């Protein structure tokens, strides 16, 4: 079976990245094309991409003129054709002045912008005759209206991937003011619309797929998700193992492999020196690369870190940005621990790689985690994850039991400062035993987190959709759940 699959998303690595969704959209189509599928990506042409894509020398090539132009929500949408840099994946860029600001998310017009984008994608799929998809693979609330609009298209199926259920997009009353809604539309917001009307729904890890069926993690949509039944499943994300390879990564001070970890000591010293920490190969160096938001467990970190630094000969490095309150608290903590703690605001890809390749442990005390990619990258680089058992962290990190020689990291269950502190202390104590610690590192490095395994599961999902009967019959009221 060869399917024509259109990935619709707000971001795609390497050209536009805020969260893990960009890594999925930028990596999975590459692997699917290697498996013989005709996969293409469509996303907004943001203002910061205008200088990168164009017909001029030195720019990523794109069509000089739009390949498609049409009225959408009373405005003209233009679509240009290009290729995702570094790949052979065709890329469609939706152009409109609303995408001109140099940002991806936020702003007063965020809901309008992505409703406009979703509408343009649906119109494009209906009317662009040179290439017509069999399946539109939608990602998060930004594209949630596409399955609703395509629900009566007999020849186009939809997959809706939930990357983070907490963000649900505009409500129905807001949608009614912006665009037209199908007569059968009965969802309260765009996240619910994507779940309700997609032929298949998946989350980015099996555990998260189970968690969101409960009131604790369902964000008010647990009944709808439970109604979805077998059409909701979890497919674990992967990572680009060619990009994230400690043997060849140019961002590292020294490359290394599972057979020779000596380069990690060089990277550790370089990381300490670069960030003004005391250079000491024997100190327990903790690293973290994350958005500073409640989801990532930053409040737990703030409650725990001062006491743990006082208890142990350890250091801590954090790279990230987010809520102003958390940024301020982290900055204050770094000032209290000169030479032992460093905070770098923003996102610096090369520094992130050096943290993976030089830190001894990687902290992920998440309140919830749909999948998480950082722990996979950390393990590939021999950086041992310390994670709370939630969502995709359950599926990727197993607790280290030294006496049995099993496990790839350290885990704790309750979202409590005491549990996090205890987990840190156990990892610190294990770090003192170099032989068992190195064996722990190597088990993590040997774990297969490539996209190949995940891509095969997505292929099976696409096959299910290709074999479905025509969809218009499913719009009758007896096949709809209660309004969601």
Swiss-Prot record:
What is the catalytic activity of this protein? [(1->4)-alpha-D-glucosyl](n) + ADP-alpha-D-glucose = [(1->4)-alpha-D-glucosyl](n+1) + ADP + H(+)
Signal sequence span is none
The record's comment on protein family reads:
Belongs to the glycosyltransferase 1 family. Bacterial/plant glycogen synthase subfamily.
* Binding-site list for ADP-alpha-D-glucose: 17
Q: Name one GO biological process term.
A: glycogen biosynthetic process
Q: Name the Enzyme Commission number(s) assigned to this protein.
A: 2.4.1.21
Molecular function (GO) terms for this protein are:
alpha-1,4-glucan glucosyltransferase (ADP-glucose donor) activity; alpha-1,4-glucan glucosyltransferase (UDP-glucose donor) activity
Which Pfam families does this UniProt record tie to the protein? Glyco_transf_5, Glycos_transf_1
**CDD domains per record:** GT5_Glycogen_synthase_DULL1-like
Which NCBIfam families does the protein's record reference?
glgA, PRK00654.1-3
Q: In which pathway does it act?
A: Glycan biosynthesis; glycogen biosynthesis
Q: Which PANTHER family does the annotation name?
A: ALPHA AMYLASE DOMAIN-CONTAINING PROTEIN, GRANULE-BOUND STARCH SYNTHASE 1, CHLOROPLASTIC/AMYLOPLASTIC
On the tree of life, the source organism's domain of life is Bacteria
What keywords are annotated for this sequence in UniProt? Glycogen biosynthesis, Glycosyltransferase, Transferase
Q: Does the keyword Glycosyltransferase apply?
A: yes
Main EC class of this protein? transferase
- Say if the entry is tagged with keyword Glycosyltransferase: yes
Q: What is this protein called?
A: Glycogen synthase 2
- Bilayer-spanning residue ranges: none
SUPFAM superfamilies according to UniProt: UDP-Glycosyltransferase/glycogen phosphorylase
The role this protein plays is: Synthesizes alpha-1,4-glucan chains using ADP-glucose.
